C-alpha cells in the first residue's frame, strides 16, 4: 500500500536532506528564475539551476543578478523555515533583507529590510505613502488573519493589495509572490509560480484588480499557474486536493 505524500512535508524533508532532483529542487529553481526574470534579471534557467545545485557561477553574469538569485533561494527556505508562523511585518521585512542583501546600488532610496523612504508608483497606480506604509501593511495582515477558509480569491486579493501598497523601494513583486507561496502552503492549497511568459497577463490582472475594474484575470492567471504545478506534483507522485474551481466560481462565492 503506497504512502500518501503531501507537498509541504516533502519540501521540508528534501530541504533538510539536501535531496537533488526532487520537487524542492525544481520549485526553488523555477520560482527564482521566473520571479527574478519578471523583474529584469538576465540569468538563464540553466544558470539559475547551476547556482542552486553547485553554489558556483557558470559563465559570465551580472553580480546583482547572481546575488538576487542566491538570495531568492534563501527567501524560499525562509518561507519553509517559518511555515508555522503567521505573516507579520517582521517576517515581510526579513524576507526583503534576505532578498536584497549584498545588492550593489548607489540609489539613495535603497533601504534593505525596511520600508521605502520615498513615494513610488506602479505604472499609473499611486502607491501608499512612506509614512502610511506600516499602518497599511498591519491593516492588511489583520484583515486576512481573521479569514478562516482561505482560497485563491483571498490569495489574489492579498497579493493585489500588497502590491498596491508597494512597501519597499524595490523587490515588492518578488516578496509578494513569495507570500502567495506561504499562504498556499499554510492553507493546504497547491501553490503556483507565475512564469515570465505570463508576465503581461499577470501585470494586467494586477492593474485591473487594483483599479477595481474586474477581478477574473488575476485569479485566472493564478489558477492556470496552479495547473502547471499540479502537473509537476503528478510527476513527483505528490498528492493534493483535486477539486477543480474556476475564477468565476471564486467570485460568485464572494457574492
Model-derived regions: residue spans:
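FIC/Doc superfamily catalytic core
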Residues: 1-255
Amino acid at each position: 500500500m503506497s504512502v500518501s505524500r503531501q507537498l509541504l512535508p516533502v519540501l521540508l524533508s528534501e530541504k533538510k536532506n539536501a535531496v537533488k532532483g526532487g520537487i524542492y529542487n525544481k520549485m526553488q529553481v523555477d520560482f527564482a528564475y521566473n520571479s527574478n526574470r519578471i523583474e529584469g534579471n538576465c540569468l538563464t534557467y540553466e544558470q539559475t539551476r547551476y547556482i542552486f545545485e553547485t553554489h558556483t557561477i557558470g559563465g559570465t553574469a551580472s553580480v546583482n543578478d547572481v546575488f538576487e538569485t542566491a538570495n531568492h533561494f534563501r527567501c524560499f527556505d525562509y518561507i519553509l523555515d517559518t511555515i508555522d508562523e503567521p505573516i507579520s511585518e517582521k517576517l515581510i521585512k526579513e524576507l526583503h533583507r534576505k532578498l536584497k542583501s549584498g545588492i550593489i546600488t548607489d540609489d539613495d532610496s535603497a533601504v534593505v529590510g525596511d520600508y521605502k523612504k520615498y513615494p513610488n508608483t506602479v505604472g499609473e497606480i499611486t502607491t501608499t505613502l512612506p509614512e502610511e506604509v506600516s499602518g497599511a501593511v498591519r491593516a492588511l495582515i489583520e484583515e486576512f488573519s481573521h479569514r478562516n477558509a482561505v482560497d485563491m480569491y483571498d490569495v489574489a486579493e492579498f497579493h493585489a493589495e500588497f502590491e498596491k501598497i508597494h512597501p519597499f523601494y524595490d523587490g515588492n513583486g518578488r516578496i509578494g509572490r513569495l507570500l502567495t507561496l506561504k499562504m498556499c502552503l499554510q492553507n493546504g492549497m497547491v501553490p503556483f509560480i507565475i512564469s515570465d511568459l505570463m508576465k503581461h497577463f499577470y501585470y494586467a490582472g494586477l492593474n485591473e484588480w487594483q483599479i477595481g475594474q474586474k477581478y477574473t484575470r488575476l485569479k485566472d492567471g493564478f489558477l492556470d499557474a496552479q495547473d502547471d504545478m499540479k502537473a509537476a506534483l503528478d510527476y513527483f507522485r505528490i498528492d493534493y486536493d483535486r477539486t477543480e474551481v474556476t475564477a468565476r466560481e471564486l467570485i460568485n462565492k464572494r457574492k
